[in-house]
Amino acid sequence: MTFDKVIFDIETTLNVDKIWCIVCKHNNTYYQFKEDRVHRFVDFLKQTKEVIGHNIIGFDIPVLNKAFGYNIFKNCKITDTL
């Protein structure tokens, strides 16, 4: 399955040392990657053409790239609503 456009947001601790969950929406379907399954978000991204979110360039993307140790968004178009 390929996802054209996916809206996403992450929830972290205040000092960003832990990712609680990542929530994505494609059409009217929600996908939730809780703390113990956050790593599965990378596989989800491999099927995604564009990610959309608010302040994802300034916050979400850097946090996730740091957590995974590389640019997990390298193959996605990025649209930030901020």
Where does each model-flagged region fall?
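Conserved DEDDh/DEDDy metal-dependent 3′-5′ exonuclease domain
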Residues: 3-5, 17-19, 23-82
